[in-house]
Amino acid sequence: MIAKDSIETAYSFLHQKQRIYVHSTLDWQKDDIELAISDYANDMSQELYDAISGGRADFLRDHKRFQEDITKAVEILEKML
């Protein structure tokens, strides 16, 4: 079972970064956010990662799909709250 505080922490962090990412016009800032989220995903509980990733090993780690992935992750986490 996924701990409620793990869901809340992940939601807060990803939601904040997603809002900045979507509105940013700075490539370096977007790259920094992608790196921070990728690192966070690496350290996230495997059970929580599996719940939001849909089985994709590169979820939140693929530059080309990052905006789509982080938006999906925030939506899923919000429903889990």
Located regions from the model:
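N-terminal acidic leader/helix
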Residues: 2-34
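Generic structural concept
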Residues: 8-11, 34-41, 67, 71-74
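Non-transmembrane amphipathic alpha-helical segments
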Residues: 14-21, 40, 47, 77
